[in-house]
Amino acid sequence: MVRRDTSPGPDHYPFRNAAVTRLESFVVRGLPVSVENSRPDIATADVLARLDESLALIEQYQPWRLRHLRRDLNEIRVVRFPCRGAWLPVEGACVTELTFLNRRDISAAPVASSIIHEGMHARVDRMGVNRYARDRAREERLCRRAELEFGQSLPAELGRPVVERALESLTLADLEVAPAIDWNEALRRQNEIDRQAGA
């Protein structure tokens, strides 16, 4: 259920990567998707197939969550990023990390749960909660509970890694469940990984 989006779109991603070799727009299961592929060793078709597989799990086991994603997100953005997922509130974009989507040592379930997690941040924003005044740890736990519910809705073997990760994170202290991230260090590590991969 992947189709190329031929409509022109604004260039609104402020972290444009100078190494980008492929920037394309698609629609996957009714969601606009932009793919910014800076890794020549990763096929865009492969990450789109994994994204489609992940959204199909959401559609099959918790279809209301896919409806929420369609309503709450402006787009899913597949891009090289220092973590597996992020919510960009100014742009209404859910980031799903390029190499995370490309992994084949995990099933589509952790990818789907990451999208659900970021989608919950989008829902909180769309509900009008002030992002500067809200309790970050409480919001992270809300997102983790959504992941847990999703994992529990899946067949046991498929959902196990999602359930385990969500349960583990729900036991963390506030500063651990919503840690401050040193984005400069995270980006440095990402760049080092890309250099080692020859990207």
Question: What label would you give each PLM region?
Answer:
Residues 2-3, 8, 26-93, 153:
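Auxiliary, metal-adjacent structural segments of Zn-dependent hydrolase domains
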Residues 156-199:
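Long, well-structured alpha-helical subdomains associated
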